[in-house]
């Protein structure tokens, strides 16, 4: 929520929300959603998100869309999620653009349309949203939506990986391991696998295990070869 107003106290924010301030209403919704300063209450969160969203606040529109997407505080309804996410996406909210892209990719709440998914992922990725950067990287790596381009895949994986997106760190490690889109470099591969593994990424943990097992086997083979070498 950059470039957003702040209030000195929770009560001042709540009063501003009651008096109709859209940003305060959005913040109050977040407080109810997360249980910050109040008891967690998803229905109250939705109430305040809706009041703010109806005043065209893009952050609240995104939150409301995600509530419909997940069924938190409202019945899950993908078409309603798409409606609010589009409102926010059209105002350049990167989280909304990413989530709208996901709906187009999966065909939930909107007709499945990979070109639209690509469009919204790119909009979001260019605004620095890591999950969108990762998905855009996947599109370029697989070549199913855009022409396959490993260099572009690496570019977007790296952008997301540097923001601690674990799947992107894992995929960037794989690119270094295999030399796809980047010069092969096992040390770099291990570095990114470790960063992803520390966040609990199972694929990275598996790849790291394979790497160390292979390294150990190579070391043992080298020792045995040295033993057999005539002196």
Where are these regions (language model features)?
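Terminal, low-structured helical/coil segments at or just beyond the last alpha-helical repeat
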Residues: 2-8, 16, 207-231
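N-terminal segments that cap or nucleate solenoid repeat domains
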Residues: 2-34
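Conserved structural position within tetratricopeptide repeats
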Residues: 15-18, 47-54, 86-90, 119-126, ...
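Short helix-capping/linker turns of helical repeat alpha-solenoids
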Residues: 18-21, 34-36, 41, 55-57, ...
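Hydrophobic face of amphipathic alpha-helices that form TPR/SEL1-like repeat modules
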Residues: 27-34, 63-70, 99-106, 135-142, ...
């Amino acid at each position: 929520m950059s470039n957003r107003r702040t209030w000195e106290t929770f009560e001042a924010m709540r009063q501003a929300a009651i008096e109709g301030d859209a940003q305060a209403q959005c913040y109050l919704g977040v407080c109810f959603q997360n249980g910050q300063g109040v008891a967690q209450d998803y229905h109250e969160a939705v109430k305040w998100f809706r009041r703010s969203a109806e005043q065209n606040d893009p952050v609240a529109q995104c939150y409301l869309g995600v509530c419909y997407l997940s069924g938190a505080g409202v019945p899950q309804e993908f078409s309603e999620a798409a409606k609010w996410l589009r409102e926010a996406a059209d105002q350049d909210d990167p989280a909304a653009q990413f989530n709208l892209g996901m709906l187009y990719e999966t065909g939930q709440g909107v007709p499945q349309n990979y070109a639209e998914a690509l469009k919204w992922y790119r909009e979001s990725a260019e605004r620095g949203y890591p999950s969108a950067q990762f998905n855009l990287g996947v599109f370029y790596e697989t070549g199913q939506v855009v022409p396959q381009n490993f260099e572009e895949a690496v570019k977007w994986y790296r952008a997301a990986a540097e923001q601690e997106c674990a799947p992107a760190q894992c995929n960037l490690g794989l690119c270094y391991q295999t030399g796809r889109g980047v010069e092969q470099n096992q040390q770099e591969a291990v570095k990114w696998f470790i960063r992803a593994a520390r966040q609990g990424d199972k694929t990275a943990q598996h790849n790291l295990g394979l790497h160390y097992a292979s390294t150990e086997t190579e070391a043992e083979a080298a020792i045995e070869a040295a033993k057999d070498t005539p002196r």
